[in-house]
Amino acid sequence: MRRMLVTYMTLGYPNLESFYQFIEKSVELGTDILEIGLPPKYAKYDGPVIRKSYKAVTSWLKDYITPLKEVRKKVNIPIIILTYLEDYLSNLDNFLTTLHEIGIDGVLFPDLLIDFIDEYEEYVSKIKGKGVKAVLFTGPSLPDNLIIKASRISDIFLYYGVRPTTGIIIPVSVDSLITRVRNLVQNKLVVGFGLNDFNDLRKALSAGADGVAIGTAFIEEIEKNGIQSALHLVKTIRGILDEYS
């Protein structure tokens, strides 16, 4: 079974030309699903690297629709939007309708099961009712019964974050966390939100993850060494995934 590479990139980072180049080439190199971040007002569950990328693009990116349409034209793999439900409470229907019209496959709100736990099923129904898939985000702090329930209604895969925020090194036992959740989940299981190195990546795959979501590492590589270096990292991670396929 092919292990999934879910590649995250902030919309428009570091500029539109480089963003499109990274997206297209990453798909050629083996990305299975694209996760594109829309900068929120307050990125409370993102780490400093991704927050910095949000800040870099919000100074000039005023329209998310046009670049998303362009991405949809360029790639034929699933596209998931990652952003915060909190920002779209007043116009959620319009937002979801727009995503559906563009051809976006799914949406992932990392705050859904944390800040809107009492209403999450209602929001999941609303998302699906607009023709958009609902990808649910879970983590170690959620009880088993909620993870099981979320896995049954999550589309495409269940996202499991091993750390409370991205890009922050907090000691956790990646393999034991994933072994626990793997025993609960029948859905595809994608692990991210805090995989810090290749060792974490291999532990996740050995423990039964169906795929990994990588974002901070790519943004850091672009910032330090440029697009080509980040694409080399995509190729390297794809190679590790294929060892476990």
Curated annotation (Swiss-Prot):
Keyword presence, Lyase: yes
One of the record's GO molecular function terms: tryptophan synthase activity
EC number(s) per entry: 4.2.1.20
Active-site residues (renumbered): E35 (proton acceptor), D46 (proton acceptor)
Cited InterPro entries: Aldolase_TIM, RibuloseP-bd_barrel, Trp_synthase_alpha_AS, Trp_synthase_suA
Pathway: Amino-acid biosynthesis; L-tryptophan biosynthesis; L-tryptophan from chorismate: step 5/5
Keywords: Amino-acid biosynthesis, Aromatic amino acid biosynthesis, Lyase, Tryptophan biosynthesis
Pfam families: Trp_syntA (PF00290)
Disulfide bonds: none
Protein's UniProt keywords contain Lyase: yes
Reactions listed under catalytic activity: (1S,2R)-1-C-(indol-3-yl)glycerol 3-phosphate + L-serine = D-glyceraldehyde 3-phosphate + L-tryptophan + H2O
A GO-annotated cellular component: cytosol
Cited function: The alpha subunit is responsible for the aldol cleavage of indoleglycerol phosphate to indole and glyceraldehyde 3-phosphate.
Family, per entry: Belongs to the TrpA family.
NCBIfam families to which the protein is assigned, alphabetical: PRK13125.1, trpA
Subunit structure: Tetramer of two alpha and two beta chains.
Protein name: Tryptophan synthase alpha chain
Gene that encodes the chain: trpA
